[in-house]
Amino acid sequence: MARMSTNSTTPLSHIRNFSIVAHIDHGKSTLADRLIQTTGGLAEREMSEQVLDNMDIERERGITIKAQTVRLHYQANNGEKYILNLIDTPGHVDFAYEVSRSLSACEGSLLVVDASQGVEAQTLANVYQAIDNNHEIVTVLNKIDLPAAEPDRIKEQIEEVIGIDASEAVLISAKTGLGIPDVLEAIVHKLPAPKSPGGDKAPLKALLVDSWYDAYLGVMVLVRVIDGVLTKGQTVRMMGTDAKYQVERVGVLTPKMVNIDRLGPGEIGFITASIKEVADTRVGDTITEDKRPTAQALPGFKPAQPVVFCGLFPVDAADFEDLRAAMGKLRLNDASFSFEMESSAALGFGFRCGFLGLLHLEIIQERLEREFDLDLIATAPSVVYKMFMTDGTERELHNPADMPDVVKISEIHEPWIRATILTPDDYLGGILKLCQDRRGIQIELTYVGTRAMLTYDLPLNEVVFDFYDRLKSISKGYASFDYTLTDHREGNLVKMSILVNGEPVDALSMMVHRTAAEKRGRDMCEKLKELIPKHMFKIPIQAAIGGNVIARETISALRKDVTAKCYGGDATRKRKLLDKQKAGKKRMRQFGKVEIPQEAFIAALKMGDE
């Protein structure tokens, strides 16, 4: 690890803390790469595509999951030297929590918009978050080297949709490096310097921006110092958890780790302090000195609440302990992921996990499978329902299999979201129908040029299954979607169970709206009929609500031709053999177990993708 001695803290007027806000795939991480390259943060041989996206899965999917940070040294055209702290934030809706914490550590944002595609749904969500944090915003139009780029039209669109002046937008191509020096100048001259109400003599007050686990150093904590100075050897206290630690090292990321002696007001860097658990470092907490604490903590964040739940089970029961260890390791880096043990009659032992959203679920599952070499089955994703019982109590339901007796429930409330969908108007009809089918309530519909912007209220339950995939297929990939949770509303919801050979399969039970139950049940039974192989006896597959069967399919039995050896002769001989076979099958059906293959589970849970 390199060492850099900086005993004097940088004056506030020469520090700029900024983040980059953009929709997925508009070139945010590539721009970060170019800024690092231009300011000499890494030598040429150390550069790789998307330097700040450390996980393989981030590079492959081309998305940023964990917010990353880097400190750049820049000599401006006016001869002054500046320190620029860039926080690269995720763009996807599930990671909005990571975005909100990163934004509160900065004073300004670069709004990156693809000059060929224009404003997308997540651009809006993240820009509004930046504006809520009182950020100064510099607009950057990327990919202007593409033949399809229309910078003038996109500038008008930004002014119309977001309402910020884009006349002086910086035109760049992050891929070729065109216009990068203009971006650096704009950061220095247009974004404000950080403020420190108390200066470096005041008691220490620092914001905990992020924390991650390093195999050698333990938990590393990313901090933004507001007042006072953070030095090696200091005893610090986390005001939220009241935990005390001695600071072992102080440093900055360039993006390599570089040790320094102290962090002053306005600076962003990392500390390590023999912290064992990432859970001890709550993001958004205030760090202060134990001996001379600050009077007031910073306005705190809310801890991330899991929104979507699903069961994860190892395909091979022997992998259970490995799965537990792997989840513990992931939890070290991702405090928004929660899990607890559960068992299922069909799938054995596993975990009930909570996630921020569907992409978060997919990524955790993929990381478990890839980094820890596990084979997993995920049950149908479900949301958190609030149940008001007849005895006046209130309960939360995370797993449909745990639903109490219907007689004891007076009403069930489900979470609703406010969704923003941007789409070319050619696909508007199909998307309106999709939202209508999913019990959506239209709030508004506006046009921006040839694009329509839809605002809908939708039940989250209808979105977690396959809404995103359907939206993409209807719009041939052009529509973009973003949502925020709004409230819980009463719904006419029922628990639908699937029975195979008279036995309920707990992993396939789900909460559905009463109006959609019959269709959902029929589809599920038909799907399972295709996927479960024939057995030696007849297998009924039923969908039921309570004691009422609402759909049924039957898998016919495999039969051996027992009459093959009878040539001509008496018909009673054949009859006797057939009756004997029938009796055997009946007995078999009583005692036979139906094996449901893994593919059948997975396909049944992916219902509605056709």
Curated annotation (Swiss-Prot):
The keyword Aminoacyl-tRNA synthetase does not apply. GO terms for biological process: positive regulation of translation. Its EC number is 3.6.5.n1. Transmembrane segments: none annotated. InterPro entries: EF-4 (IPR006297), EFG_III/V (IPR035647), EFG_V-like (IPR000640), EFTu-like_2 (IPR004161), G_TR_CS (IPR031157), LepA_C_sf (IPR038363), LepA_CTD (IPR013842), LepA_IV (IPR035654). GO terms for molecular function: GTP binding; GTPase activity; guanosine tetraphosphate binding; ribosome binding; translation elongation factor activity. It is found in: Cell inner membrane. Keywords: Cell inner membrane, Cell membrane, GTP-binding, Hydrolase, Membrane, Nucleotide-binding, Protein biosynthesis. Pfam families: EFG_C, GTP_EFTU, GTP_EFTU_D2, LepA_C. One of its GO terms (cellular component) is plasma membrane. It is an enzyme of class 3 (hydrolase). The keyword 4Fe-4S does not apply. It is a peripheral membrane protein. Required for accurate and efficient protein synthesis under certain stress conditions. May act as a fidelity factor of the translation reaction, by catalyzing a one-codon backward translocation of tRNAs on improperly translocated ribosomes. Back-translocation proceeds from a post-translocation (POST) complex to a pre-translocation (PRE) complex, thus giving elongation factor G a second chance to translocate the tRNAs correctly. Binds to ribosomes in a GTP-dependent manner. Belongs to the TRAFAC class translation factor GTPase superfamily. Classic translation factor GTPase family. LepA subfamily. This is Elongation factor 4. It comes from Rhizobium johnstonii (strain DSM 114642 / LMG 32736 / 3841) (Rhizobium leguminosarum bv. viciae). The gene is lepA.
